[in-house]
Amino acid sequence: VSDKVERILHPEEFKMDVLLVEPGKYPQRVQIGTELEDLQKAVGGPIEVTYPFDDPVGIICNEEGKLNGMDLNRALYDDEGRVSDIIAGPFLVTGLTQDNFQSLTDDQMVMFEDKFHSPETFIRMGRSIMAIPVPDDVVCEKAEGMKPREKPAPDIEAR
């Protein structure tokens, strides 16, 4: 039986449960196909895979995200807690086999949702860049399509 026929007969076998992390949003557990086209669609273009963690997981991101001006998303940190890279655009966190991607385990799903839970904004400070977590109320308002609340000007009495 050909691979294409197998995919039609058993489509669930060619899907994986992964974490989708989009700029300005909380991570989401999603089910995605394992084909290159599925991965490219999820990240909005050609894919690049990085392996920044000791766990058997990969980060699939848009290879041209920074070049194309996609929104900065989340920082990756070195062992000393310094920003080592910033991912631009949406990315996927997937489990790994010896030669392919696979679903994250439940423990990995929880661990990486926690690691990437807070959306970040970035500030250049001299030669370094700082990642600042976005407050929950701002994330929630963006999700509802609202602008962040503006603080009213304090009442000042003329003396």
Predicted features and spans:
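Non-Sec secretion/translocation targeting segments of pathogen effectors
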Residues: 144-159
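Detector for the mature cores of small, proteolytically processed
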Residues: 8-42, 46-148
